[in-house]
Amino acid sequence: MSEHPQGQKHCSFCGKTQSEVGKLIAGEDAYICNECVDVCLDLVQTSQQVEAGDWASKALPKPHEIRAALDQYVIGQDLAKKTLSVAVYNHYKRLKVGQSGHVSKDVEIAKSNILLIGPTGSGKTLLAQTLARLLDVPFAMADATTLTEAGYVGEDVENIVQKLLQKADYDVEKAQKGIIYIDEIDKITRKSENPSITRDVSGEGVQQALLKMIEGTVASIPPQGGRKHPQQEFIQIDTSNILFICGGAFAGLEKIVQQRQEKGGIGFTADVKNKDETKKLAELFRQVEPTDLVKFGLIPEFIGRLPVIATLEELDEEALMQILTEPKNALTRQYQYLFNMENVDLVFEDSALRAVAKRALERNTGARGLRSILENVLLETMYDLPSRTDVGTVFINEAVINGEAEPVYKSERQPKEAVTHESVAKADLKVIDSKSA
């Protein structure tokens, strides 16, 4: 213990005795006085302010730069990318202005959370993940179908913020600038347009619970790995500056939009439309209005918290082909990297990739289905390769994708210049035309 020769207890940091300070706090082998505690607190707070200032001084990517970064990972969806780029830029510009202290007393910029509407596998989750990675902010994802009102079996809405705090390594300041993506938001719609006497704890009840969280409130989060109980101290997280992005497929919403448009008028000025005419899904989604979402089952207050609506298109065959070959994290590139680790080249014929795209379209799973198709096709090959030393190249053609043939094995590896294809030269992928196999 820290004691003077005379036996008086003293602070291990400044050396002052117990009689010279207001309070002396005992540790296992040392003491610290109240004055040194105050100094330490000031140092910690100053350090946090410097870190916050560092973030505020970082150059914020402009909308064009955000869009360019999204283009590297997400194919198509031009309107959604543009909408997201502007919304995210304005959101973090608002945060920087707030931290710099140059806040206008006359104008208060409200938070613009985002609603993504698009079919399954169109890139909603990937867009949100890419944004978080680009901006270097914590990112957490939640499934709305697992959420229930507090007190019922299921996940509490505050668990979403806890996930974000975990991603930020329990750095509160960092977490409060993060992005939360809530998927399957269309699955928590009201079960009926009419009020019900039975409590809807996983539909409208969850929407009500999310309202304050999305708008901005102080959430009480238990410490690391803990569960809530009355005696513990909670970590306070202000959600006012957390960007919430909600996404969903909203199957059936297009019919509501079309019905509204086909009502027309009365008399000679009526807009007569052929009801058999069906518009493209993307075109209908682009014309979504808040009243359509209310009819779908979202409550007006919830829609009001998501003022920015970005719609995504269904992916066609060409888009799926591009997804297989062009992005930085293209699936073909990922599998070729895995095969290269076994000192084997993986070569896809152009017709094979088109067959993969066609099968994904038939399954109606969008880009999400591409991986499962390739995984099934390459399963036996990936099982055998680590045990073989006589394979240098594996060729995949259309017949292999369709289950009509086995992959072709060759002992020698391919010269790099022989396996590049014009359509994917920029991506540096080993994709060859079916005629040159």
Curated annotation (Swiss-Prot):
ATP binds at residues 119-126. Residues 1-52 form the ClpX-type ZB domain. The keyword ATP-binding applies. It comes from the Bacteria. The keyword Metal-binding applies. PROSITE patterns: CLPX_ZB. It holds the Pfam family ClpB_D2-small. GO terms for molecular function: ATP binding; ATP hydrolysis activity; ATP-dependent protein folding chaperone; protein dimerization activity; unfolded protein binding; zinc ion binding. GO terms for biological process: cell division; proteolysis involved in protein catabolic process. Keywords: ATP-binding, Chaperone, Metal-binding, Nucleotide-binding, Zinc. GO terms for cellular component: HslUV protease complex. Zn(2+) binds at residues 11, 14, 33, 36. Gene3D superfamilies: 1.10.8.60, ClpX chaperone, C4-type zinc finger domain, P-loop containing nucleotide triphosphate hydrolases. InterPro entries: AAA+_ATPase, ATP-dep_Clp_protease_ClpX, ATPase_AAA_core, Clp_ATPase_C, Clp_protease_ATP-bd_su_ClpX, ClpX_bact, P-loop_NTPase, Znf_CppX_C4. PANTHER family: ATP-DEPENDENT CLP PROTEASE ATP-BINDING SUBUNIT CLPX-LIKE, MITOCHONDRIAL, ATP-DEPENDENT CLP PROTEASE ATP-BINDING SUBUNIT CLPX-LIKE, MITOCHONDRIAL-RELATED. ATP-dependent specificity component of the Clp protease. It directs the protease to specific substrates. Can perform chaperone functions in the absence of ClpP. Component of the ClpX-ClpP complex. Forms a hexameric ring that, in the presence of ATP, binds to fourteen ClpP subunits assembled into a disk-like structure with a central cavity, resembling the structure of eukaryotic proteasomes. Belongs to the ClpX chaperone family. This is ATP-dependent Clp protease ATP-binding subunit ClpX. It comes from Acinetobacter baumannii (strain ATCC 17978 / DSM 105126 / CIP 53.77 / LMG 1025 / NCDC KC755 / 5377).
